[in-house]
Structures are given as structure tokens and as C-alpha cells.
């Protein structure tokens, strides 16, 4: 992902690999570890965007990548909101959120009331085998005033049986 992480008006690079999430500071590309080893299994995705208007991006992360386990949320999938410290070059505090198995992709979505929701897309529906079974539960997470408190979710869709990616787009002119 590309975003300004420190309000210096320069685009920084944010990367997620199996064990680490880090940002690389423009223009020296100095690496700053945000979090390490959120779960037993690999990190799989990040959503990066300035959602509070302070010029510095916020981050959510998906982890516990285990696409073969489609039922047990303790063995497959994890969603985290990462709370930044005052000094963003230091480690961030992960807040684990409720989730569906096979967490796969996520994006920040600007709602019509100009607030941001985190939309999370699993790879498979619960108990799904060979693209048969329950549909993928795409959820929108609503940020509470204190992100350490429980996040409410809204079901966006549950009709697909396997999904690999998504993006946010404005398809019409209604601004919503």
C-alpha cells in the first residue's frame, strides 16, 4: 500500500508479509516495524488509509491465513485494527476484532456520511467445500469512538462462494 504515514506529505510504502507489517519512510526508505506475528499463521492483507483526516494513515490487518479451514474461527482468519503510538516509528497496538474464517482481503470505505468503515472479504463461506455451502460473508466494520471497544458489523453480501479480491468504486453520480 502507498500512504503518508507521518504527515510529511510524502507517500510512504506499507508492506505485509507472513510475519511482519512494516512501513518504509520516504525518501530514505528506512524500515519501521508496525507489528510482528499477529497470529500463529501468516498475515494475509492490510487496509491502509487516512480515515481521521490528520494526514497520517490508519491500518487494519488480516491474518491467521488458513484457507483450508472454513468453519473454525480460532484456526482460520483474524482481523485487527492497529492503534498507532504517538511516535509512529515505534510498534503499534493490535486490537483483535470479530471475524469470519478465511479472512482474505480488506479495504477502507468512505460512507455517505463521510465516516470510514472497514470492509472485509473472506475467501470462502463458512463450511464451504468445493465452492458449495454457505456464501462468503462480506462484512462492514463500524469504528467505535474508542477502537478498543467492540466494533459493530453490517452484512454487505453473502451470495458468493469463493472470492479473491475486491475494490471500492463510485459507479454512478449520486456521491453515495
Where are these regions (language model features)?
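Beta-propeller-forming repeat regions
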Residues: 1-176
Amino acid at each position: 500500500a502507498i500512504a503518508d504515514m507521518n504527515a510529511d506529505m510524502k507517500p510512504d510504502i506499507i508492506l505485509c508479509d507472513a510475519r511482519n507489517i512494516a512501513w518504509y519512510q520516504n525518501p530514505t526508505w528506512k524500515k519501521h516495524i508496525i507489528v510482528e506475528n499477529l497470529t500463529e499463521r501468516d498475515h494475509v492483507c492490510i487496509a491502509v488509509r487516512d480515515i481521521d483526516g490528520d494526514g497520517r494513515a490508519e491500518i487494519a490487518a488480516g491474518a491467521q491465513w488458513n484457507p483450508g479451514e472454513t468453519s473454525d474461527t480460532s484456526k482460520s482468519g483474524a482481523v485487527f485494527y492497529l492503534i498507532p503510538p504517538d511516535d509512529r516509528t515505534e510498534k503499534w497496538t493490535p486490537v483483535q476484532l470479530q471475524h469470519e474464517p478465511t479472512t482474505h482481503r480488506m479495504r477502507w470505505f468512505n460512507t455517505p456520511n463521510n465516516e470510514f468503515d472497514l470492509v472485509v472479504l473472506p475467501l470462502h463461506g463458512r463450511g464451504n467445500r468445493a465452492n458449495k455451502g454457505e456464501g462468503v460473508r462480506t462484512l462492514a466494520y463500524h469504528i467505535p469512538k474508542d477502537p478498543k471497544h467492540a466494533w459493530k458489523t453490517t452484512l454487505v453480501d453473502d451470495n458468493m462462494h469463493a472470492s479473491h479480491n475486491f475494490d471500492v468504486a463510485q459507479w454512478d453520480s449520486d456521491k453515495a
